A protein has these predicted regions:
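Amphipathic alpha-helical segments enriched in hydrophobic/aromatic residues interleaved with Lys/Arg
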Residues: 103-137
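C-terminal regulatory/effector modules of DNA-binding transcriptional regulators
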Residues: 1-2, 35
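N-terminal regulatory/effector-sensing and dimerization cores
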Residues: 7-108
């Protein structure tokens, strides 16, 4: 695992497992500029408030919920409170999700935030131990 060596902000990367990447990060203020991913970004805010622009609206992720950012959707990120924010994120190729769904259509989470208990439990299991290799989906 690598850990960014900065005074306050850091990013921890879990060992790569095929088409899945996992990170845990902390940002005290500005997190990242607007960008896109080719993958689904599925995660959870662990502490603080994670604020981000997504689909032309300002969003705020709190501990206990689930973030699902769809491929090729522009988003940014910053702390929504003075304490900063810590989160874990899983980046998954769309084909892998479709395979896990048995070919059913890919899911869509409007607005990027979900309080669905099934999704929260599933993402928590995948994000739990950053130093543990993932099991196949």
């Amino acid at each position: 695992m690598s850990h960014a060596n900065t005074p306050r902000d850091w990013v921890l990367r879990a060992p790569q497992h095929g088409a899945v990447e996992r990170i845990e990060a902390y940002f005290a203020g500005h997190g990242y500029d607007p960008h896109r991913h080719d993958t689904y970004a599925i995660g959870q805010t662990l502490a603080g408030v994670q604020s981000f622009r997504y689909r032309r609206s300002q969003r705020h992720s709190l501990p206990g919920g689930c973030l699902v950012l769809h491929p090729d959707e522009l988003h940014d990120g910053e702390a929504g409170s003075q304490e900063g924010f810590r989160y874990r994120m899983l980046y998954v190729e769309p084909a892998l999700i479709q395979q896990a769904l048995g070919g059913r259509p890919l899911p869509f989470v409007r607005g990027g935030l979900s309080d669905d208990p099934r999704l929260i439990a599933a993402s928590r299991a995948l994000l739990q131990a950053m130093d543990t290799p993932l099991e196949p989906l």
